[in-house]
Curated annotation (Swiss-Prot):
GO cellular component terms, semicolon-separated: ribonucleoprotein complex; ribosome
Record-level Gene Ontology MF annotations: large ribosomal subunit rRNA binding
Annotated keywords: Ribonucleoprotein, Ribosomal protein, RNA-binding, rRNA-binding
Domain of life: Bacteria
Keyword match Ribosomal protein: yes
Protein family (similarity comment): Belongs to the universal ribosomal protein uL10 family.
Free-text function comment from the UniProt entry: Forms part of the ribosomal stalk, playing a central role in the interaction of the ribosome with GTP-bound translation factors.
Quaternary data: Part of the ribosomal stalk of the 50S ribosomal subunit. The N-terminus interacts with L11 and the large rRNA to form the base of the stalk. The C-terminus forms an elongated spine to which L12 dimers bind in a sequential fashion forming a multimeric L10(L12)X complex.
Protein name: Large ribosomal subunit protein uL10
GO biological process annotation, one example: translation
């Protein structure tokens, strides 16, 4: 019989998984004794600055939440001590913050893999995720792609109107009586 606390934890994880665009699964014990409280606090602070968060949870509860959200692809990554990083808005910034933390020399936090949307990614693909455009950049690219044909049409119409005006002005000049020199 599940306890009330486990039910609440599954609900929280389900909510986080459904909101997250990127989910990174890692082993937080890695080599030696694992992450210290200070290390975990520092990682949480860095991720929070970029709109992400890291949670340590039981694998069985994570599997239940993943299946509730249609993200059962996470199941193979959920073994052993597990920390899950959630990126809600700017996936690239959260991935970069996580990668910077990993490069800082902490061997006790090792990425097992990630889920970007519904695509399961290997651990080494995290660096590629950092190269994705931010939400604002992606929107600007879409708007630019939509606006480019419109501005081209405006330019063509302006040129056509100008040409008609030049022809009319030339005809007016022809019809005006020539002044004697």
């Amino acid at each position: 019989m599940p306890t009330q606390r486990k039910i609440e934890t599954v609900q929280e994880l389900t909510e986080k998984l459904s909101r997250a665009q990127l989910v990174v699964v890692a082993d937080y014990r890695g080599e030696g004794r694992g992450m210290s409280v200070a290390d975990m606090t520092e990682l949480r602070r860095k991720l929070r600055e970029h709109g992400g968060e890291v949670v340590v949870a039981k694998n069985t509860l994570l599997k239940i939440a993943a299946n509730h959200t249609g993200r059962g692809a996470l199941d193979p990554l959920l073994a052993g001590p597990t920390a899950v990083t959630f990126a809600y808005d700017d996936v690239a910034k959260v991935a970069k913050a996580l990668l910077d933390y990993l490069k800082s020399g902490n061997k006790s936090f090792t990425v097992r893999g990630a889920l970007l949307g519904q695509a399961l990614l290997p651990a080494d693909a995290l660096e590629q995720v950092t190269k994705l455009p931010s939400r604002e950049q992606a929107l600007a690219q879409v708007v630019g792609g939509i606006a480019a044909p419109v501005s081209g049409v405006v330019g063509v119409l302006n040129a056509a109107i100008s040409n008609v005006l030049y022809v009319l002005q030339a005809r007016i000049d022809q019809l005006q009586p020539q002044s004697s020199s």
